[in-house]
Amino acid sequence: MISFILCLALLIIGYFTYGKVVDNTFGPDDRETPAVSINDGVDYVVMPQWKLFLVQLLNIAGLGPIFGAMQGALWGPIVFLWITFGTIFAGGVHDYFSGMISERNSGSSVAEFTGKYLGGVMQNIMRVFSVVLLIMVGTVFAVGPAGLIVTLCKNGGLSGVLTTTLFWLILILVYYFIATFISIDKIIGKIYPVFGLCLIIMAVGVIIGIYTNPEFTIPEIWSHMYSMHPAGTPIWSFMFITVACGAISGFHSTQSPLMARCMKSEKQGHFVFYGAMVAEGIIALIWAAAGCALYEVTGGLNTGLAEILSGGQSAAIYLSLIHISEPTRLRRIS
């Protein structure tokens, strides 16, 4: 538990120290932002800072820092260090600069300002790269929540169409299209902050559940300085790939321009971009701690991972929450 608390403290300290160094390096000033100068009522709309933060957090987080961090805990508490230092020195820096460079270029997408600074060839490469990865990410962000809702419905005693993945996928895709064509402050600006807050509350609930439940123990880094991973999955490079979201995910650059178009002042960038990445790092740290504790309780790293992940991503998250809040219920379900 001490290792977890120290890493949590480092993330918070990193926001106020190194995050400020990054902010001063960029040099935000009092110039008009795109939200003020363009203000088209669709994509360029001034929104409150707290909304910008929560929308940005949900845009970059999602299932990534939950499921990835849980899998990353397979290597033991050493993953805490990767999440902590990756967030402070890489993830936060990347998110901040991608958002602020976009803001200085009229809120342009990453492909567009890449073309401005690196030329047309790199611009086209980035366009193709963005489209392909956005399709992949969009698929995961549709299938994952749909599966989680189906799991909740089934375990809640519901039946019929509500327990089919296709039904929820269609609803999610309909929402995708509506949110895409309607002004950003009408749906995304109203719904996303609520979901972002839920993401934070869920993470807080998880760590409280672990702390108050004597069945769980978060292992210390200094007690596990040996190789904890199973054969065939070395720390380098498997851990760094598995735990990308919550540490160093580069795909956040496609999301940062959305909020760059809605800032009233450049000075909000530190809180919105760097701060949201630190918040994601904290969420990932909590879920990694949950993974370490859960794997030990459910039979060690190898068998624990197999049990938690046996039903897929959605079932893994559901079972983890149930196991933390009510350990005996997991045994009844299985």
Task: Locate predicted features.
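Extracellular loop-to-transmembrane helix junctions
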Residues: 2-19, 72-102
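Transmembrane alpha-helical segments of multi-pass small-molecule transport proteins
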Residues: 5, 126-133, 153-183, 199-202
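Selective recognition of specific alpha-helical transmembrane segments in multi-pass small-molecule
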Residues: 7-17, 130, 134-138, 196-214, ...
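Membrane-interface "cap" regions at the ends of multi-pass membrane proteins
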Residues: 10-66, 262
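Transmembrane-helix boundary/entry motifs in multi-pass membrane transporters
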Residues: 38-51, 57, 103-134, 325
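Hydrophobic, membrane-embedded alpha-helices of multi-pass small-molecule transporters
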Residues: 48-64, 207-215, 225-290, 325, ...
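Hydrophobic alpha-helical segments and their helix-loop junctions in multi-pass secondary transporters
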Residues: 138-156, 167-168, 180, 199-226
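Residue-level detector of conserved catalytic or cofactor/ligand-binding positions
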Residues: 320-334
